[in-house]
């Protein structure tokens, strides 16, 4: 009997998911991860699928496109979503996780699988033979980047993502902080640091004049809106933050009974509830400046920072030119790409791309027909976008209902439209899974 083998480069969210989907279909996997031999910027552990930005996988409800994407992944036996469901922490209407428990679970699951061989070493060249999934992520090493550039024949597009700081609960002044979720939704999942106008103006002035960490001159900064450094956002105008991460809508300061001028929210970062991250505070400020500037936030005057914010490169290919909706290269169909390097944006989207690449690589290994997900599903809509979008200004994309085909009926409310989109998607996905016998690939 012929042994089917697939090489997966990178054990981030996409690579881990791809390896899992392959192994559960009887495919032997060689999974390569350069950590701990070599650490890219922003990574702190050797665990697979380390979350280097937020610990939130965003909205849980299926009326939201990313909530639907997660539910579709559950139907497809996603390892990443299983790990998230097993390690969730309170986060209102979002699915947030204990980041260490989440990554450890994924690592141990893959290490224990008899069909997965783990190689803790850097890959500098794409194998010349065999099926390969490149899931090296937004922090692809320089040597592998050069190799990918050779294979794709395309120049890289790149920008920076920025991670938010994490503080300890016990170091906060809870006389100034209150627990609540906006509009009272879900549990009182967030710590809220209210600011009056004077406090906000002092904080804003310190922020826009703070010293930033240096960036190499040859690297042009192009920020994705979903992970915009807070100081860059602030530089757009004095009130910009009040309509972004510091928006006070839906919150009432119990000390005054009124809506604050601005609010900084902190979200639980671990299962024990001892660590909290500053929501929307991705930053590239120098560490000393972060300590100084963020102490202007009420309640954080003496905060203990267990992790300062960092900024890191995010590299992605021009997928509309290079990839099929199966995530195979058009010119080299034995090579798949998956994760953020394809131009999807977000943890869940990256894992979903890994899921698709894994299923299709298994099909290719078994000489079966490869699959293109229906465009009415979140998976299909996202893959359709990244492989057919205009190449003139191709930008990373989160999943959104704007990518889906229009509904045949007109509904007024956003929530009602989202619910209808989700119900249609899940019904079509269920029928498609049965028709294509995905579990039998």
UniProtKB/Swiss-Prot annotation:
Principal EC category: transferase
Residues annotated as binding FAD are 10-15
Q: Which cofactor does it need?
A: FAD
Biological role: Catalyzes the folate-dependent formation of 5-methyl-uridine at position 54 (M-5-U54) in all tRNAs.
Give its localization: Cytoplasm
Gene name of the record: trmFO
Q: Please give the chief subcellular localization of this protein.
A: cytoplasm
Write down the Gene3D superfamilies for this protein, in alphabetical order: FAD/NAD(P)-binding domain (3.50.50.60)
Q: Where is the signal peptide?
A: none
Cellular component (GO) terms are:
cytosol
**What InterPro entries does the database record attribute to this sequence?**
FAD/NAD-bd_sf, MnmG-rel, MnmG-rel_CS, MnmG_N, TrmFO
Q: Name one GO biological process term.
A: tRNA wobble uridine modification
Q: What is this protein called?
A: Methylenetetrahydrofolate--tRNA-(uracil-5-)-methyltransferase TrmFO
* Protein keywords: Cytoplasm, FAD, Flavoprotein, Methyltransferase, NAD, NADP, Transferase, tRNA processing
The GO terms describing molecular function are: flavin adenine dinucleotide binding; tRNA (uracil(54)-C5)-methyltransferase activity, 5,10-methylenetetrahydrofolate-dependent
Which family does this protein fall into?
Belongs to the MnmG family. TrmFO subfamily.
Which transformation does this protein catalyse, written as a reaction?
uridine(54) in tRNA + (6R)-5,10-methylene-5,6,7,8-tetrahydrofolate + NADH + H(+) = 5-methyluridine(54) in tRNA + (6S)-5,6,7,8-tetrahydrofolate + NAD(+); uridine(54) in tRNA + (6R)-5,10-methylene-5,6,7,8-tetrahydrofolate + NADPH + H(+) = 5-methyluridine(54) in tRNA + (6S)-5,6,7,8-tetrahydrofolate + NADP(+)
Query: Any idea of its EC number?
Result: 2.1.1.74
